A protein has these predicted regions:
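Well-ordered alpha/beta subsegment
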Residues: 156-160, 165-166
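Conserved small/polar residues in nucleotide/adenosyl-binding loops
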Residues: 167-174
């Protein structure tokens, strides 16, 4: 594949790599789906009123969700630290996350997965991904030589941090 074909393939996969599957989820009410759709299209976390509205509909604890969102940057920073400690070779010259632009893309992806997790937690919907979007992400990662083991470690770290938060804060189901 030449560079023009490669760029076209990457561009097509980026367009397909929409991972949020909550926009049409039948167990989420229409108002909550609309709020999630808007936030997802704008690639942002939920705002306070959106959190409160979605949590009221789903019966989840808006304070726990708001706290998790307020800590998002810290969680991504801890993922960076974990990955840099456990897989330092990825950041060295010749590593899959070198130069800095490549590692910054990894952190953006972590933030986006965390963003999706916040929507899922607020709506109390664990099945939150779009299968075709996830498949496109996998293809994109393969095409761009994203280190799968590194991304897996980063996402596992994120999951552990959020799980720890949920166990140490009031239950997300408490109102």
């Amino acid at each position: 594949m030449n560079s023009t074909e490669s760029r076209a393939a990457i561009k097509a996969l980026i367009a397909k790599a929409q991972i949020c599957g909550l926009h049409h989820h039948p167990e989420i009410n229409e108002q909550s789906r609309d709020l999630i759709r808007t936030a997802d299209q704008e690639k942002r976390m939920l705002h306070k009123r959106e959190i409160e509205s979605i949590c009221t509909q789903s019966g989840t604890n808006h304070e726990a969700i708001a706290f998790m969102i307020s800590e998002a940057a810290n969680y991504v920073d801890r993922c960076k630290q974990t990955l840099q400690t456990r897989q330092a070779h990825l950041f060295e010259e010749g590593g899959a996350l070198h130069p800095t632009e490549r590692s910054e893309a990894c952190w953006r992806d972590c933030w986006n997965f965390l963003r999706l997790a916040s929507y899922a937690m607020a709506s109390d919907t664990p099945e939150c991904t779009d299968a075709s979007g996830i498949q496109a992400v996998r293809q994109l990662y393969a095409l761009m030589n994203v280190p799968a083991a590194g991304m897996t470690l980063a996402l596992q770290t994120l999951s552990q941090l959020v799980t720890c938060l949920l166990y140490t804060s009031p239950s997300p189901r408490d109102s």
